[in-house]
A protein has these predicted regions:
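Signature of extracytoplasmic/envelope-associated structural regions
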Residues: 1-306
Length: 306
């Protein structure tokens, strides 16, 4: 008998016919549950049947999450593309924007798991003074299955750099061309609200006997996309008057700077809104909660990734 340890897990992404090894922290999670429909069995003539009966015919969307440290070599650039880019689709001459779909493979000490037709529903970039730059990913897929043991052959994996150089960065923020000082930390979140279309039919439900022939989700629509974040700043005599500030039309630029002062990653939110709030702590500070109101392509607003 052998056990599977999280620290030994390897994660791969398959997109466009190519597979990529993605180096993650141990913050990997994936699962899928089945939906239960209960029904009463108590009748007028038999009041003793107090416990409900049940039917299980369909699965809920699979859930996954993982954290990727970003490196100078940018071998994880496929992840950045999947976060930002949308694909235009057309149905009955109506054009819609869909998220890029991909497969995830996770190899453990005893198994190889696959999550099919994945989409990213959330990405969180969080950075502060000279900390390693990471992005936290979460999303959903249609089906989770075990496709083999630890020796399962995934085929050709895209080549990767011989080295992995972690990035220690610090945040730099400008609001309407004014540089913000005394910054503690910055976070930027990209959220995709996904609604899975109904997929249960009476005919298919009658054929379900176990998980192998259960009904799984297959199609979705993106109902809303949100780009937002928070800037945390020490309160000083230079910015004390801004603790209750707000704006509905500002140009916000968030940059992740390397130790040598060059920019590794940057996003421009223009126009955007923000509200300021004060935090009472050992050292007084204030936070700016911001959100993009710009509907242009997100990929064009990430102005630097190099």
């Amino acid at each position: 008998m052998s056990y599977s340890f999280l620290k030994e897990s390897k994660l791969y992404i398959e997109y466009g016919g190519s597979k990529y090894r993605i180096y993650t922290t141990t913050a990997i999670s994936f699962s899928q549950t089945f939906a239960e429909d209960s029904y009463p069995v108590k009748t007028l003539h038999d009041q003793s049947k107090m416990l409900a009966g049940t039917t299980i015919t369909k699965a809920n969307p699979a859930q996954f999450s993982f954290t990727v440290p970003l490196t100078a070599e940018k071998d994880e650039s496929i992840v950045m593309d999947l976060i930002t880019d949308l694909v235009a689709t057309s149905d009955s001459d109506i054009e819609t924007q869909q998220l890029k779909s991909f497969n995830i493979y996770v190899q453990t000490g005893s198994s190889t798991f696959k999550v099919e037709s994945c989409v990213i529903t959330g990405a969180n970039f969080s950075f502060s003074q000279l900390e390693q730059f990471k992005v936290e990913i979460e999303g959903q897929g249609t089906k989770l299955s075990r496709i083999g043991n630890e020796s399962y052959n995934l085929g050709v994996i895209q080549s990767e750099s011989p080295t992995r150089t972690p990035l220690l960065i610090y945040p730099e923020v400008t609001v309407d061309s004014l540089n913000m000082t005394s910054i503690i930390s910055v976070s930027v979140q990209i959220q995709n609200n996904v609604d899975w279309t109904p997929f249960e039919t009476l005919h298919s439900s009658l054929d379900v006997t176990n998980s192998s022939n259960a009904m799984f989700p297959s199609a979705y629509v993106v109902s809303e996309r949100i780009v937002s974040g928070t800037i945390n700043q020490y309160q000083t005599d230079n910015n004390i008057t801004q603790f209750d500030d707000f704006s509905t039309n500002s140009n916000i630029n968030v940059l992740a700077k390397k130790k040598d002062g060059t920019t590794f990653w940057a996003i421009q939110i223009n126009p955007g809104m923000y509200t300021a709030r004060m935090n009472v702590a050992d050292v007084y500070n204030q936070a700016y909660d911001f959100r993009s109101t710009d509907n242009t392509a997100l990929g064009t607003r990430i102005t630097t990734y190099s």
